[in-house]
Amino acid sequence: MPPKPLFPNVFPGDGAPRKRRLALALLAVPGLVPAVSYAQLSGAAAQPQPLDSPWDLRLAPQLEDHPLKDGAKPAAFVIADHTSGTAEQDLAAKGSAELRRGDAVVKADAIHYDQDTDMADAYGQVKVINGGTSFAGPEAHLKIEANQGFMTAPKYHFNVTGGSGSAERVDMVDNERSVFVNGTYTACQCSTNPAWYIKGSRFDFDTGADEGTARNGVLFFQGVPIFASPWMTFPLSGERRSGLLPPTFSMNSSNGFELSLPYYFNIAPNRDLTLTPRIISRRGVMTEATFRYLSPSYSGTFTANYLPDDRLAHRNRYAIYWQHQQNFGGGFGGYVYYNKVSDNTYPEDLGSANQFINGTQTLYQQEAGLTYNNGPWSVLARYQHWQTLPPSIAPYSREPQLNVKYTKYNVGGFDFGAEADYSRFRITTADATEGDRIVFNPYISYGVYGPGYFVVPKVQYHFASYDLNYLSSTTPNSPKRFTESIPTVTFDTGLIFDRSVRLFGQDFIQTLEPRLYYVYTPYRDQSNAPLFDTAESDFGLAEIYQPNTFVGNDRIADANRITAGLTSRFIDPRTGDERARFVIAQQYYFADQRVTLNPGQAAVLARHSDLIVGAALKLGSGFMSETAFQYNQNNNQLVKSSVGFGYSPGERRVINVGYRYTRANTTLDNQPINQFLVSAQWPLTRRLYAIGRFNYDLAGDRVVDGLVGLQYDADCWALGVGVQRAANGINSSGQQNSSTRFMMQLTLKGLSTVDNGLVSAFRAGVPGYTPLPPPPPPMSRFSNYE
């Protein structure tokens, strides 16, 4: 018969030594303690497995809690070299004493336990373990089941979160809450000399709420105090909690030294607020606030920045950014994008003060809209306005716009649809044409697809009606009301051949894909139509199979041309990955294109377009390449070229080299683009990584932007530094301004992890950049099971 719990069987005078192996056997009695195992399984494998004999123990495949029945009390067990006590009352245990009751474990040189009050007094090398938290000290007094009591000079460790520290005294309130007096806290795993720690006069820990609070706290890093506060809160794990975020230090040539001290408010699981005082040495103190909200039917972000009495600009400066998405249900939705700055130089002076960016934003969108999407229907109603900063040219605003689209696929083999749009165009530029425009664009196509071919004829129609209420002085004789009707016919066809080939000792499937694309659009005079939303489209592989050489609805190019292209791919038959692709394409004109963007421009008189050639390679060992060329055969000139190579043999190892060239043209103010670019992320040691980006303008003999950074990844902290020099607007003489910025970001793992701009800059500047690894996941409370 299995032995019973120890306490009811201890009689007065029973002080004989007990063999430890016998006491340990008590703990193995089935049903008295939870079965344990370190394997974590699921499904049928996670169920206890019976053995052949009904009297054998069952296997427990994972650690489990077995709650007691209502009204039941947990059994208590004692292990010691010597025990003595009174039945049903108290017990004294000496010599490697150990008391267990429920989830609680007390170990000490000597333990006195009063069963009536559930009070345990432990002396000498005391260790208390309860609910995944362990305390070690010279003396402890506590109620076992309630986990209420105190310990002197404790050292503690939260098994689940990894936090630890020491104090003069700890008062245990319950299984989740504890109060430490004159103590320390760190999430570093090393027991001595942690890289960072918080020292305070009092700590309140709540493992259930995953939150710690320090009174009169001082944050130390490498033994040096870096921050102090009379009250601070912090998370005990990686979950979101209110508290201080890592400070950000930066320096640039216009603002001087800057220090940002963000504080995070975890208002609710779906709402938070980050409040950041930003000390700018040359301008003053700026306040930034970012509020985020999320619900099943809406979400958004609101950010406001305010700098009172800028010491350099001698005025108040501010910026507002608001993005909101709304789902009303039934396919209805809405949104708001509102961005505004106080003055024309705000982006240059303050917009990128603590973040690295390339260039300066000069267009700020102010838009609100309602949407509807249901099956083939798509509807947009919006009001759109722009705040435009020099030197940008103000675009037209839509005040308002109503856009309706209908699309249907494969109805008896036909695809058809239409787009209807009404817009009222307004602009802040003086002496510019304004008015209303209605557009209706229906289409129908019939596609025939086979295993190795496709044929898609398509007919589309463009109807536009203009009602202009103001004409620019440059076009005083243009009509205010007129319409346009322009049909377009396209015929798209291609073949697909494939074969098996073997190259460089590897098998591939090679395809050969010739394609012909014919477009016919008759000429219609469109010189009376203003350019509300229209520009010349780029010319490349993405645009060469499009019917219109313009983007927007104010110009439809006349066309009688055919595009001939040939694509060849090399595909890995085992994985389906495309390892190489080669493309060549060119347009051939049967008639001159007479429609131009602006009246008076010369018509396109060439017999064929520039030749487009492209290639993409994805080889083994992390090597890849993309190349594209645009070549003018008539002038024997290279119009555009783009060459890029990438090498990434492993994680956080990437090198990119690129070159791009664009011949001077009127769009570029007759200035060519001739730039060389290299970027990389590479480990210098096991913990130290270098990041760099260098963009050099060969034509202008200047650095467009450069970025150099280092990241160091330690066990419980990470440090990143970066220096960037970039173009930053245009000065009064029309020359490019350049600014230099320095930024440093310290991350204390286990305290808070946030990117204040440096990692985002590395990611944007280096394609393929991989951030430093996150902290390891929290341990199970059974990881240090005793």
Swiss-Prot record:
What domain of life is recorded for the organism? Bacteria
Which GO BP terms apply? Gram-negative-bacterium-type cell outer membrane assembly; lipopolysaccharide transport
Signal peptide residues are 1-39
Outline the segment boundaries, as ranges, of region: Disordered: 767-786
Q: Which family does it belong to?
A: Belongs to the LptD family.
Q: How does it assemble?
A: Component of the lipopolysaccharide transport and assembly complex. Interacts with LptE and LptA.
List, alphabetically, the GO terms of the cellular component aspect: cell outer membrane; transporter complex
Q: Which InterPro entries match?
A: LipoPS_assembly_LptD, LptD, LptD_C
Name of the molecule in the record:
LPS-assembly protein LptD
- Gene coding for it: lptD
Q: What is its main location?
A: membrane
Protein location: Cell outer membrane
The top of its lineage is: Bacteria, Pseudomonadati, Pseudomonadota, Betaproteobacteria, Burkholderiales
Skewed-composition ranges (Pro residues)? 770-779
Q: What is the purpose of this protein?
A: Together with LptE, is involved in the assembly of lipopolysaccharide (LPS) at the surface of the outer membrane.
Task: State the organism named in the record.
Answer: Burkholderia cenocepacia (strain HI2424)
Kindly state which keywords UniProt assigns to this record, in alphabetical order: Cell outer membrane, Membrane, Signal
